[in-house]
Regions:
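Phosphate/dinucleotide-binding and metal-coordinating scaffold of catalytic cores
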Residues: 1-209
Length: 209
């Protein structure tokens, strides 16, 4: 048994089939591929048109490209999903999707813990990873992120998770882990727009931030 929840902000507005979160009961997934998991994000096809499958294949590819650069990255797993109308009892679609690793698991793989904080200064970020991170965001044309603060002043960051040693001591470095690549120039989804304050006309324009 699992619980399915809608998630995302932009994609809930743009997609007829938005991304979802799967919540598992630990006892129900023992011995399965999902053992030990309690919650996973699933990226879906967004709209019924088959061309939208290509956008999310490209997004999944972005995650895997970053896996080659650093271990401080989200791993993903592709799926073929049968969606069934539980009222009619009919299979409505067989579509591509992918799962995103939980941020706690990313931290654990790297001997760290996920960090929840309102904001951080740039000097706290681990320099080598930040260099790789920034160049990767430029390469894929990602403008929709912040590793220092989020839209909610009580929560850092925007499309970035933080991992760090715990307890966090003065001088300890923090590692940024990016996610949500659907609005990048690499994917170039029809609903993707650059942030207004950057003064760009298209997400396919590159800007080093």
């Amino acid at each position: 048994e699992l619980t399915v929840e809608r998630r995302g902000i932009k994609r809930q507005e743009a997609c007829s089939f938005p991304p979802i979160r799967l919540r598992f009961e630990k006892d129900e997934v023992k011995g399965s591929a999902f053992r030990g998991e309690t919650s996973l994000k699933m990226v879906t096809h967004c709209k019924d048109s088959e061309r939208f499958d290509q956008y999310y294949l490209l997004e999944m590819m972005a995650y895997r490209m970053y896996n080659l650069i650093t271990d401080y990255s989200f791993r993903v797993r592709s799926l073929s999903v049968n969606y069934k109308d539980t009222v009619k009892g009919e299979v409505e679609a067989d579509r591509f999707a992918f799962l995103i690793e939980d941020d706690s698991d990313v931290a654990k793989r790297n001997g760290l813990k996920k960090l929840e904080i309102d904001r951080i200064g740039p000097s706290r970020l681990e320099k080598t990873t930040v260099g790789d991170f920034s160049l990767f965001q430029l390469m894929i044309g990602n403008l929709d992120w912040s590793a220092l603060k989020g839209p909610d002043p009580k929560e850092c960051c925007h499309n970035v998770k933080l991992v760090a040693p715990r307890p966090l001591e003065k001088g300890d470095k923090i590692w940024p882990v990016p996610y949500d690549f659907d609005a990048t120039g690499l994917v170039d989804a029809p609903y993707a727009e650059p942030p207004d304050h950057l003064g760009l006309k298209s997400v396919t324009q590159r800007l080093y931030r």
